[in-house]
From Swiss-Prot:
This protein's UniProt keywords: Membrane, Transmembrane, Transmembrane helix
Membrane topology note: Multi-pass membrane protein
A GO CC term assigned to this protein in UniProt: membrane
Protein family (similarity comment): Belongs to the IIV-6 213R family.
Subcellular location: Membrane
Name of the molecule in the record: Transmembrane protein 213R
Primary residence: membrane
Source species taxonomy: Viruses, Varidnaviria, Bamfordvirae, Nucleocytoviricota, Megaviricetes
Domain of life: Viruses
The keyword Kinase belongs to this UniProt entry's keyword annotation: no
Pfam families the record matches: P9_TM
Keyword Acyltransferase (UniProt): no
Amino acid sequence: MSKQKLWIDDLNSFFGDWSLIPTSKMTREEKLNTITRLILIASLVLLLFGKKDASLYILIIGLIIVIVIYSQEKPSTVEGFEIINGEIVDDEGEKNEIATNLGTPSSYQGGASKGRTIGGVTLPGGRAPIYTCNVTYYPTTMSGNSVMITGKNNALVGPQNPKTLMPPPIAPPLGDLDTWKASEWTTHSHVNSRTVQYEDEAGPFRTFNNNDERVLPVNCLSSYEDDQANNPCFRRYQSGIGIKNEIGIMEPFEHTPNLIKGETPPLIKELDEPYEPTFARRANDEKDIIEPFISELQPGIYSSNIDQPILDNAGLLPDMPQPQTTLFTPMINGKPRDKMQIYVEDKEADAIPGITDSGYHTLDRAYDLPQRYVRERLPKRYGEWRARRSTMPGIPFETPVGYGSGARPIGSFPTEGAVVSPPGNACTGWVTGIENVRDLSGQSEMSEYYNKNKLDMFDVDENAPLYAINPDAVKMHIDVTNRFRSDMQESLMRKRNAEAWQRKMYPLDTNHRRMLGGTGQF
């Protein structure tokens, strides 16, 4: 046993060694002496550079810390073993006989002695066999119990760990579909209802509202433009068996009657214009087919042929029939109006007699156009064209003045339709209707019917008028958004489920895989 003193107890121990860094082989007193030397040298260096306050501060604080630590602990000793005349002598003075030949391990019969306990281990008495290790000089019994270093090998007590006998899991490659592909063993829920087998057999389908209906390309319905494939139209869902999902028309896609050999089938069925409105989904070869269990809305127009029952002239009450209508392009100055198509009646309207005696505007002739605008079942609009009683200054009171026309004295200036006054240009009367107001068809005066709505002069398609297309577009946008969100949620849930199962089946553990026979790679 070697004992050291602190420099407080023995000043010579401070100058006996000039080590500045403590090591693990030093005793506590030697470590404190080394730390004190380091503090003293650091203080002297700071003092040489003019740092008097810092030097004094470090020196005082360091010495106080060393003294306090030393005063609170007991002196420590380094225990060891010495071989004296073939005997191991420990710090307690106990002796253990060992073999004199330490070149190789050997066993011998120890002398008879009573059993004693050292370090919690009871050593056998008598002539128990003793095994001597020539490396550590620590004798151990044949049973494996250590004499001087008890507890060092307790971690290996017992049989072999059974986990070491299990082969390491090696994940199959990503291309192994039999392992990674999803199966029918799926817990279905509102976000996980699709199976891979069904999708492989039936194709992709939308999952919104748990609907298994397949989504196929859009079936374009418009026939206004030549390029029908690029014409915008609303989405239609079709069944997955190659049959059109339309009421009244159930035939395969490939079937096109009266098709010339070598001719490409049309994208949609040709409409029988102008005999039927564009919303009638009937081809030439089908217009004579009698369809049972239907109610007639208009002559030749049935409920089963109408895609949307809220169209312009569809869905009328049975007791209020309307005449047949035709899509008409108005003419202005002998030229068709650009992008303007309206529905007109095939039957010519009756002439409306004028009411000139009561002061109303003259309507005593039949209109030039043989076709009339299609209007709602509303009273004829005499209101806008009814002559009003003038109250303007300079115009005789209650002079009939037409709507939109500028009343002026006769002969005030020569214009088309003006009446030439007698000599002297005297004002002999007032006339109306000199400034003609022309409608879309080039007629000199507006129609006698009310307009249906403010969108009546805009483009319409065969699905619905503009005022009905917009709500449908909004509803479709909401449906598509919800369907996209549902699909994304289901896709994300399936992805997270797959990742969780992969980590559970093949954990990311690569420790000692090469040592246990694995590849060492995940």
